[in-house]
């Protein structure tokens, strides 16, 4: 499955440390959350790719991530404050986790619009998207009422599996700033 990090916050200058999600209303079937390890994905890159990516930066954009919402009637007006508060930011494609020291591939399909400079056709970014979304880097969390998931936004992507319609899924989220 594709994991794009639903509320990743990679589009922020200082992304949050982590998130806690509590399942309040859980569908009888479906509605799981997928997690993907960006550090394990980095570990499996060839040495050539690691060296090539080390000096690259990518642009992460709230506007890019919410382009469909912005195109809706009144969307730009509705999200005007969020657009002002979240200008595009540049982050290294390869970041070092501040606690573990492990390197991670710091891109995602939702907010990463492009790599600066050397990737005009998007082939490097598409390679990275395909690489980090491999099943071997993923785990699936199946929710029960009041289950709690905690993850490190600096090294893990997450995405809900939207396969539970017409059932309801209600979560409460706590974001931990770094």
Model-derived features: positions:
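Non-heme Fe(II) oxygenase catalytic core, chiefly the N-lobe of the double-stranded beta-helix
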Residues: 1-148, 153-178
């Amino acid at each position: 499955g594709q994991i794009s990090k639903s509320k990743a916050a990679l589009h922020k200058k200082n992304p949050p440390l982590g998130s806690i999600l509590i399942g309040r209303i859980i569908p009888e079937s479906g509605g799981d959350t997928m997690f993907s390890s960006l550090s394990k994905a980095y570990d499996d890159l060839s040495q050539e790719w690691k060296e090539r990516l080390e000096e690259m930066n990518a642009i992460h954009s709230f506007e890019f991530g919410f382009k469909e919402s912005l195109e809706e009637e009144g969307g730009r007006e509705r999200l005007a404050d969020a657009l002002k508060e979240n200008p595009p930011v540049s982050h290294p494609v390869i970041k070092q986790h501040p606690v573990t020291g492990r390197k991670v591939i710091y891109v995602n399909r939702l907010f990463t619009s492009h790599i600066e400079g050397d990737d005009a056709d998007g082939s490097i970014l598409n390679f990275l998207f395909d690489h980090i979304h491999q099943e071997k880097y993923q785990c699936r969390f199946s929710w029960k009422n009041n289950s709690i998931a905690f993850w490190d936004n600096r090294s893990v992507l997450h995405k809900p599996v939207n396969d539970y319609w017409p059932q309801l899924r209600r979560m409460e989220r706590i974001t931990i700033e770094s």
